[in-house]
Amino acid sequence: MTQRKIIHIDCDCFYAAIEMRDEPDLAGKPLAVGGSAERRGVIATCNYEARAYGVRSAMSSRHALKLCPDLTIVKPRMDAYKEASREIHTIFRDYTDLIEPLSLDEAFLDVSEAGHFSGSATRIAQDIRRRVSNQLHITVSAGVAPNKFLAKIASDWKKPNGLFVITPDQVEEFVASLPVTKLHGVGKVTADKLGRLGIVDCADLRSRSKLALVREFGSFGERLWSLAHGIDDRPVQNDSRRQSVSVENTYDTDLPDLAACLEKLPDLLETLSGRMARMEGQYRPGKPFVKVKFHDFTQTTLEQSGAGRDLGSYEQLLAQAFARGGKPVRLLGIGVRLHDLRAAHEQLELFSRQ
């Protein structure tokens, strides 16, 4: 059996990072994203400067301001966060299609079969971190391990902006010293019960038989036994029904005008055509679209029903999109909306059985 290679990517204070990127004056100061104190708002996330004062997610904004009177609280901009998340996932898909999103800022990747960097999951994680930093100007932390349980723990090990790797031969020793509170599914109630039994870390858990743990905790006891031995067979479960396929590039030097943008289209279209070819028979291509992000991080996306997917069609779309901003461009993307042929086939099978 092939040894699995799982990466867990977790953006560092994601919402706050996007706000500091888009408003540089906020950087280096205590910042939170959430509702206003006057309206009994709650903190969604905060940067590390705010955390130093004890500010935390899910805390009331009023209490956060008591802890940190200089705290700046900004309203969430979900569209901006979703767009950044989409850009990150576009990077992920250059390495694998086995992606399990946990939230906008967090995902598992199974790179067991990836051919990049001779199959090195560590180098893939390094490259993802580099590209996210260069393209989005935010940082992510990454954990690399043989399973999801350990990869998630590893990503938190050197936060923020860190990478931690647990190789298969390190699993046994690493897990033995883990506090039981680090185990997936162990909350305060279970941790307290384990503590009363004299079980503080995974070494203590290993001293108990699987049967004894099942007697104490029911079916979850078996899960506890497995985790204490570093075992987690849960697969990375991706939503395989894709809405679109796209390719985009962030340029080292801003493209100054439309002509410079148009010069980049053939290379983008060649890459897109290759990705489309790999999906033949699974999806029917629909509307083409272009995405333009200008040098000031404003952006626009334009799609058109009935348009072709040839170079000329993308040139027309790009010209219209560029006209919306008329400024130097830092990122260009092109893509196609998709219709899932597999879903349609499943519907036909369903009706044929009735």
Curated annotation (Swiss-Prot):
Keyword terms, alphabetized: Cytoplasm, DNA damage, DNA repair, DNA replication, DNA-binding, DNA-directed DNA polymerase, Magnesium, Metal-binding, Mutator protein, Nucleotidyltransferase, Transferase
Active-site residues, record numbering mapped to chain: E106
InterPro entries: DNA/RNA_pol_sf, DNA_pol_Y-fam_lit_finger_sf, DNA_pol_Y-fam_little_finger, DNA_polymerase-Y, DNApol_IV, PolY_HhH_motif, Rev_trsase/Diguanyl_cyclase, UmuC
Cofactor: binding comment: Binds 2 magnesium ions per subunit.
Primary localization: cytoplasm
GO process terms (BP): DNA-templated DNA replication; error-prone translesion synthesis; SOS response
GO terms, molecular function: damaged DNA binding; DNA-directed DNA polymerase activity; magnesium ion binding
EC number: 2.7.7.7
Compartments in which it is found: Cytoplasm
Gene3D superfamilies associated with the record: 3.30.70.270, 3.40.1170.60, 5' to 3' exonuclease, C-terminal subdomain, DNA polymerase, Y-family, little finger domain
Enzyme class, UniProt record, top EC level: transferase
Catalytic activity: DNA(n) + a 2'-deoxyribonucleoside 5'-triphosphate = DNA(n+1) + diphosphate
Sequence positions that bind Mg(2+): D10, D105
Matches recorded under SUPFAM superfamilies: DNA/RNA polymerases, Lesion bypass DNA polymerase (Y-family), little finger domain
Domain of life from the UniProt record: Bacteria
Known cofactor(s): Mg(2+)
Residues the UniProt record annotates as site (Substrate discrimination): Y15
All residue ranges annotated as the UmuC domain in the record: 6-187
GO cellular component: cytosol
Entries under PROSITE patterns matching the protein: UMUC
Assembly with partners or alone: Monomer.
UniProt family annotation: Belongs to the DNA polymerase type-Y family.
The protein's role, per its UniProt record: Poorly processive, error-prone DNA polymerase involved in untargeted mutagenesis. Copies undamaged DNA at stalled replication forks, which arise in vivo from mismatched or misaligned primer ends. These misaligned primers can be extended by PolIV. Exhibits no 3'-5' exonuclease (proofreading) activity. May be involved in translesional synthesis, in conjunction with the beta clamp from PolIII.
Designated name of the protein: DNA polymerase IV
Organism the protein comes from: Pseudomonas syringae pv. syringae (strain B728a)
